[in-house]
Amino acid sequence: MLLLSCKTMYKTLPFSETPIPEAPDYNNNDSWAVLPGQYPEELISITGKSSQSDVDVFFVYPTLLTDKKDSSWNADFNRVDIRKNVLTKSVKFQASSWAKAGNIYVPFYRQSHYKTYVKPYDLEGPASWKIAYQDISKAFAYYLEHYNKGNGIIIAGHSQGSIMAKELIKDFFDDKELQNQLVAAYLPGVRVKKNELGSIQPMYQPEAIGGFVSWNTYKKKKYPKAYEQWYKGGVTTNPITWDKTTKTSRSEHLGTLNSDGKIYDMAIGIEIVDGLIWSTVPRIPKRFLLSFVKSYHFADVNLFWKDIEVNAQLRAKTWLELHKTN
């Protein structure tokens, strides 16, 4: 049986009739997109070579499995195209913003197809999401046992990656001993309510540690169709000032990482409304094309790439001063 919607037309079978891809073995380096000491060229091309740090960054990439003709519910991380997308899209343009703050770890995982967030396919979503989180949870547990060695931890993600990261925070940090090692959690691209993560609370100072930041970016004066359901009421951090400032001009913006690999400063001004960041059209090459785009979800990280890079280093420095002084 094929499940086809008039609007979305995703070719798919019921979850129960679809083969589940092989699980990653995190003892095998091939199950990691990024490990310290063996950064891929895609990452090095943006950040340069890394130096060892007493802070680690555990990054979970967003939904990259989106093809409407792909009938799978979960990604096969061994597929060449999937591995390439992770490196050339998310690692290069997203994970790179945290590279100067710590040692980067990015596990491959059997992420859920985008359709699991679209009606009527979302009815099968929970079964698919469970597989995705099983992988991320196992990857993080493996990281803790074999790599962490008492280092500070930055948890970062985007979109589906932030959904996975939220669950990590609940399971491994909230009221747990590991909470003392949490530098910060960066959770853009998904709604996070103030008390959703228990003792891990929102941060409203640029040097604060031990909490989380989150935001969702949209074109100025525009609202998503599902605003009430997916955005309203979420914590909305100002990712330029990192405080409770609700309007920030272009002059304070440190930089957007564009698809050409260049950073453009003073590119956007923002305004915070309930659950959203409203952004001006970025002043970057080919900006005319962006003037027709309402949702900047795809650029939640890229738009504030340099701002994140600088802030993550500040929070890492603060944590190190408190925990690693001799």
Region annotations inferred by a language model:
Residues 137-149, 171-318, 322-326:
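Surface cap/lid and interfacial helix-loop subdomains adjacent to catalytic sites
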Residues 56-60, 105-108, 154-155, 184-187, ...:
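Structural recognition of the beta-strand scaffold that forms the well-ordered cores
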Residues 6-91:
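Flexible, membrane-associating and regulatory peripheral segments of lipid-active enzymes
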Residues 62-150, 285-302, 313-325:
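Active-site catalytic motif of lipid deacylating hydrolases and related acyltransferases
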Residues 157-161, 165:
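Gly/Ala-rich beta-loop-alpha elbow adjacent to hydrolase catalytic centers
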Residues 166-170:
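Short, hydrophobic alpha-helix immediately C-terminal to the catalytic nucleophile
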Residues 53-55, 100-104, 149-152, 179-183:
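Loop/turn elements at helix/coil->beta-strand transitions in domains of secreted/extracellular proteins
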